[in-house]
Amino acid sequence: MSMKGKETMSEQNERIVMGKLGSTYGIRGWLKVFSYTDNAESIFDYSPWYLKLKGEWVEYKVESWKRHGQGYVCKLAGLDVREDAQLMTNFEIAIDPASLPELSEDEFYWRELFGMQVFTTKGYNLGEVTDLLETGSNDVLVIKANLKDAFGQKERLIPYLEEQVIKKVDREARRIEVDWDPGF
């Protein structure tokens, strides 16, 4: 059981946000790119990109990209002048979930954990996964407790430590089993 592709992006309307467009670069429609992927350059492995315009995802092809200073810039097809590109500043870059690599049965993406119910090894329902935090030493599940939690908890932070705390992730049943004291 391993987590692959630790993307810390949100899934919205069947799209997965992988980064954001920054300010323009030059006069020919190039834009700075801020990638949320572990390896920043891998954002360019996904095509097409989707940008949200007036509440709707619109498909764009990356015509070209290059490294610039400490970051990256790209040229989107159809954006040929600075003024058009400026309208895209700060737009989120999303992809279709089908673009992600297939994983083996014991692997999953972080986004799949959102909404899963978390139970102790003794069967107590701790609540639902609402967020994941990267702390440096280990990742942490943020669990929203059930309304009538017997221990009076509203939220729990559970370290994502495979085998030690996380005993099983069942993607099909949308359930995570943990060795955790419900009082914490």
Swiss-Prot record:
It comes from the Bacteria. One of its GO terms (cellular component) is ribosome. Keywords: Chaperone, Cytoplasm, Ribosome biogenesis, rRNA processing. GO terms for molecular function: ribosome binding. One of its GO terms (biological process) is rRNA processing. InterPro entries: PRC-brl_dom, PRC_barrel-like_sf, RimM, RimM_N, RimM_N_sf, Transl_B-barrel_sf. The keyword Chloroplast does not apply. It is found in: Cytoplasm. HAMAP family: Ribosome_mat_RimM. Belongs to the RimM family. This is Ribosome maturation factor RimM. It comes from Vibrio atlanticus (strain LGP32). The gene is rimM.
